[in-house]
Amino acid sequence: MPKNRGAQSQIGQLLIIGFDGTEMSPRLASLLTKIQPAGVILFARNIAGAEQTHTLLRECQKHVATPLFTCVDLEGGTVDRFRTVVGSAPSPAEVFATGSRALFRKHGRVIGENCRALGFNVDFGPVLDLAYEASRSVLSSRAVSDDPKHVVAYAREFLRGLRDAGVLGCGKHFPGLG
């Protein structure tokens, strides 16, 4: 990190921030300029359309000196921020139920391609939690198995698919929901 950077911007490089709204505002521009975060994360509340999303991410980058991690939380199924923009993606559990590693990878690749098309370079997925009965109400179709070996097999292929599309993946949840 350059020596002339202040402590505040160095701390900012540890943060990925979310915000309200679907367009750049003076308040958001000021926040980005002041904090200089490592990235931004958009949720459904920020995504109204493909062009709007791409524009918003480009506008965010204009206020930050270093390349941003442009992040989204997208798994398919119940956690699908692009549903209204590009259509629904199947849930991880639905894809896992096929037993096809090729489909696990394709699931990641298709999600990754949609991410890239909208301007994202990071997806907060896949879910690495185990599908225990006690966590079923929170995870439902998001967790693929109660067997760690099966979870790893799905996650490995999903992440390869994201990588094939030029998107970084980030396994979650820590310390865990299941």
Predicted regions and their residues:
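Enzymes and membrane/adaptor proteins characterized by extended Gly/Ser/Thr/Asp/Glu-rich
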Residues: 34-151, 178
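Short, compositionally biased "basic patch" segments
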Residues: 1-7, 172-177
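Generic enzyme active-site microenvironment
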Residues: 18, 71-72, 170-171
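Alpha-helical segments flanking ligand/cofactor-binding loops in enzyme cores
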Residues: 30-33, 113, 156, 160
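Phosphate/pyrophosphate-binding betaalpha-module
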Residues: 154, 159-175
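Boundary/entry segment of secreted carbohydrate-active catalytic domains
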Residues: 2-23, 158
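Zymogen propeptides
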Residues: 17-20, 26-35, 47-48
